[in-house]
């Protein structure tokens, strides 16, 4: 029971009343000593702390990216539609790796859009009559 830290004003859990000031002080010193020993025993090198922080920052940024909602499909207009090469009907969007997508649904949607663009040589996707 040497790892147990007792309340400062009581000798043990079963005791119903406070103890004197000297015992309280001794309990406090004992508790601080135990905390100090545990802190020294669990010392982590600076290198491990650095790697942990890098890992934590990386995982936090990944989780933030997953929280972003996908863009509104109706408001999308590809930049290729405004380029001179796009007028000839040659629309080329480089393939992306699957980890750049929010989810499988968004990947499928973009693949359908790419199919539509490759079939539609007049680029009607960017000219709306609204």
UniProtKB/Swiss-Prot annotation:
GO biological process: negative regulation of formin-nucleated actin cable assembly; protein localization to mating projection tip
One CC-aspect GO term: prospore membrane
Bilayer-crossing regions: none
Domain of life: Eukaryota
Name of this protein: Uncharacterized protein YGL015C
